[in-house]
């Protein structure tokens, strides 16, 4: 197989990375690969703790695709078994454990989502439950003998919890060993992960060496900050943009990020767009609004199509720039001829509770036919022409009495 030059490969592989352990070893593996004509095997694992992948996952998936574009082979591991342990990386307390059924259910759609980025024909998909689930207790004891408690406490999250006298469960020590056994089983050449995975990647490297296998090169990628601009992107923190979001939601969420994140998002999520990326970067200082809109369009286009991106932008402008209701609102016919505004908002699902409905009215985020509602005690007449209720920025309802 013909590969690009070693320097061309290194230029693409090192782009956007945080750390490579080590660059010299990576170069040696690339040279050997070029001489033999055999592609390197590049491993990436994803625990299905939630059913949806999000743009935070796309950062490492995009790097895996970079390797594929250079002619190398991707191995995507669905961590059905490790998800039952719960990755302690970056956690201040023990993570809830998933059942085998929950992990399998969540992981079912991961591959379909991942191939929005990866080349499916050049990707091996596997579940680590296949080999980790087959290990005996004697195997686990032998595996555990390769690492000490002192080594485990070297990782920051364990050390901080130990000093704070927060409990650390024994099964949490097994997580990096289990992930490391993935590398022993697969004999991969390179493993990718976020910066929070560095310890786990190094354990895999050590275990490969212990088992007489050439140690993997470890490559860490930046963690994508969520749309709130504060924490790592996570579905549990409600700051994520998911692969399965609709084009409209994906565009709107992308536009909601702080201006300070436009460059980071663009570099990490749009590196494949070349000239378009450079144009976005050149606009950030002079016109961040245009830069952010272009960024959001390209994100949607990447996961759907340019046409879907244009439609999502048009939808956003109609709702939030021109403040018009969508054309396709379903008419909801209510039994009552009138209703207190608080009750109406909760009935429609615009507010989860009466107290939240009051808060929305107080914040002046409720209107009926473009007229702001500021009175908690307002009673809304429902007879006659249909009315458009707007609650917050994104919720619209078309209502009338039966």
Curated annotation (Swiss-Prot):
CDD domains reported in the protein's UniProt record: S4 (cd00165), TyrRS_core (cd00805)
EC number: 6.1.1.1
Keyword ATP-binding: yes
SMART domains: S4 (SM00363)
Keywords: Aminoacyl-tRNA synthetase, ATP-binding, Cytoplasm, Ligase, Nucleotide-binding, Protein biosynthesis, RNA-binding
Native source organism of the sequence: Chlorobium chlorochromatii (strain CaD3)
Residues involved in ATP binding: 235
Catalytic activity, reaction form: tRNA(Tyr) + L-tyrosine + ATP = L-tyrosyl-tRNA(Tyr) + AMP + diphosphate + H(+)
PROSITE patterns: S4
Biological classification of the source: Bacteria, Pseudomonadati, Chlorobiota, Chlorobiia, Chlorobiales
Subunit details: Homodimer.
Protein name from the UniProt record: Tyrosine--tRNA ligase
């Amino acid at each position: 197989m013909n590969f690009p030059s070693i320097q061309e490969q290194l230029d693409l592989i090192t782009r956007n990375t945080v750390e490579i352990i080590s660059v010299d070893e990576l170069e040696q593996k690339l040279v050997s690969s070029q001489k033999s004509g055999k592609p390197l095997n590049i491993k990436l694992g994803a625990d299905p703790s939630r059913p949806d992948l999000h743009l935070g996952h796309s950062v490492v998936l995009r790097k895996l695709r970079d390797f594929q574009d250079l002619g190398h082979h991707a191995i995507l591991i669905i961590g059905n078994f490790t998800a039952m342990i719960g990755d302690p990386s970056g956690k201040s307390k023990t993570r809830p454990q998933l059942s085998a059924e929950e992990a399998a259910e969540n992981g079912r759609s991961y591959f379909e989502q991942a191939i929005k980025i990866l080349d499916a024909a050049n990707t091996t998909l596997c579940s680590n439950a296949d080999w980790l689930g087959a290990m005996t207790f004697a195997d686990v004891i032998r595996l555990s003998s390769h690492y000490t408690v002192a080594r485990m406490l070297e990782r920051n999250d364990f050390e901080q919890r130990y000093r704070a006298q927060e409990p650390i469960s024994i099964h949490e020590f097994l997580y990096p060993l289990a992930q490391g056994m993935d590398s022993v089983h697969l004999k991969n050449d390179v493993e990718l992960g976020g910066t929070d995975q560095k310890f786990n990647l190094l354990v895999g490297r050590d275990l490969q060496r212990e088992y007489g296998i050439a140690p993997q090169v470890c490559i860490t990628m930046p963690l994508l900050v969520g749309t709130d601009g504060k924490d790592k992107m996570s579905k549990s923190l409600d700051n994520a943009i998911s692969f399965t979001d609709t084009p409209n939601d994906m565009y709107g969420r992308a536009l909601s990020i702080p201006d300070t994140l436009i460059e980071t998002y663009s570099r990490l999520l749009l590196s494949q767009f070349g000239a378009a990326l450079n144009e976005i970067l050149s606009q950030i200082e002079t016109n961040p609004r245009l830069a952010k809109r272009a960024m959001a369009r390209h994100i949607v286009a990447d996961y759907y199509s340019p046409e879907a991106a244009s439609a999502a932008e048009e939808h956003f402008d109609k709702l939030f720039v021109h403040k018009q209701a969508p054309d396709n609102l379903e008419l909801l016919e209510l039994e009552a001829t009138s209703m207190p505004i608080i009750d109406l908002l909760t009935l429609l699902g615009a507010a989860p509770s009466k107290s939240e409905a009051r808060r929305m009215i107080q914040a002046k985020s409720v209107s009926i036919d473009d007229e702001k509602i500021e009175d908690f005690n307002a009673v809304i007449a429902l007879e006659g022409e249909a009315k458009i209720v707007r609650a917050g920025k994104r919720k619209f309802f078309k209502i009338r009495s039966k």
